[in-house]
Amino acid sequence: MELLKRIEELKREILNNPSDSFDIILNNIPKYTMYGYIRECNKNNLDRYALRFGRKRYTYGEFIDLIDRYAKGFAAMGIRKGDRVALLLPNLPESTIIIYALNKIGAISDNIDPTSKEDRMKYFLEKEKVNAIVCFDKVYETSIKSIENYIYNELNIDKVLITKITDSLPMIESAMYRMKYRDENIVKRVSTSYGNINIFGINRFLNDSRYQVCYTNPYVENEVATICHSSGTTGVPKTIPSTNENVNFIAFQHQISNIDYSRVKTFLHVLPGFAQFGFSDSMHLGHSLGLEMIEIPIFSQENIIDILLKTKANCLFGTPSFWLRLIGSDKYNNADLSFLEEAVYGGGTLTITQLANINRFLISHNAKCLLRTGYGMSEFNGTCILEDPFMSTPGSCGIDLPGGSGIIINPDTMKELSCGELGHLYYSKGSNPVCEFDGEVLHKTINIDGREYIDTGDIMKKNARGEYFFEGRASGMISRYDGYKIYPNALENAVTSSSYVEDVMISEYYDESNFGAMPLIYVVLSKESKGIDIKDIIKNIIDNYILSNNNMSFRDIPTKWKVVDELPYTTALKKDYKKIKENGIDGSEISIVCHETNMGLDYYDIVMPTKGKKLIKK
């Protein structure tokens, strides 16, 4: 039976037997590769649009043809089943095409943050046994070019495919882009630099494979299809492998749910593909639903709403800051949102008042939806829990998507808690995460009533309706406005490595300009700092202990600094983090203004306070 017809049958079966929904879905998980799944979902709408970039649009028929052409290209490169190909790419049509092309031939796409530093790049390429690299031209210059000797001599990687924005643009638009931005042909410039490394561009990649015979990898149960990454407890992104079932299951859950996507035709794809929420929850879900994905390779928090209004995309998955920016600027007072059919946020929280204000704005500006929230984990390939904004209890993040099941556990007794009691969320899905990879145990599971559950590390409670309420993260990590996770202990250790620092505390504050959390630091200076300008000290710490730290990102930079004589402590002689969080900011702080986009940090400014107490240095 055709997949989409079977999905409709299962929806009716679940409606008639809601208490058995988990087992019904568990016994009917689609058996396709990622490539096979989107091909099956779209075989009857090949004339509909699949991708858009600038003025260039591709139908699903053209999209699948391109996947097949690129698959031939990788076969001609010598890429085989099981090979791992590192992708260092922003959201471009080529990025999506390449992912499915690799999946078609049974190779594994290893999606790495293109802003990763040199040492972290080496770490990923070696640890994850990469066989070849595909990277954006700008990323080649910043991250790959300097380690060419290493990747060939140490890792035996001898193939690098380079993509460019102009590869995706129509001829005239491509020429205009080259004129405006002085686009250089990196492929020509480096192709003979290292005789042992084959560096080439898309045109040669496709031309050299015109007569290549391509093998389509058949579906094999529990075969790893892709690798993404997420920050671990040390702040170092950890490897998250996913099977075809893991990736397809997210789309399957949405398709089998009661969410109506029939009016959604276009999806603004801004969440990055190296993260599961951009890969499974956005890219693969969108194509499984037959939507036109509008690819946005580079954006900033300041222009994301402008992009939404310009493209008139029907659907946007984003962070809370996107939507707070919409209601926080007078420039959008007259915005017409009549095109918006689905709006979703994750990676952070909104207060009940903030959510009400956003929904009031959406309704008054003609949007066809309310803002929907949910909860998920990268380890589960994204969303696990999703709300119906028209029916949910205020403050809830929703109920289980079909095929998911969560229970609240007391971590001390390991007993399930009653409704309304706080505990650790343990979660299970019809397609659970890969628990062991390359000989390493990634997750420990516990068996409860015949199902395997994983500790999410998040504190929640659940009501009698099955709705979940997120209360915090057990690890105490800070979730920035853009969803990036900061680990206070790791950041404190980095800053206190400076001889100018005696002690520090890291907390968070609400950043009104970004509509979300940002890191706040309390600093006690050491004797070595005497006589040195405070701006020089801060610059030294940022440059030498954060930006130069291989386990940190520019996103770890505290944007508010308080220099104090002593840190607050509780009566139990423990640092009082609760107090500094409650105190927040008062204008006496030194501000770090970071000029950043999703592709990296351009520069930062140190701004001294204009009011408050005079800073005292030891």
Model feature map: region roles:
Residues T59-G61, T216, A225-F249:
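Conserved AMP-binding A3 loop
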Residues A175-M179, R189-V190, Y194, A313-F317, ...:
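Gly/Ser/Thr-rich phosphate-binding loop
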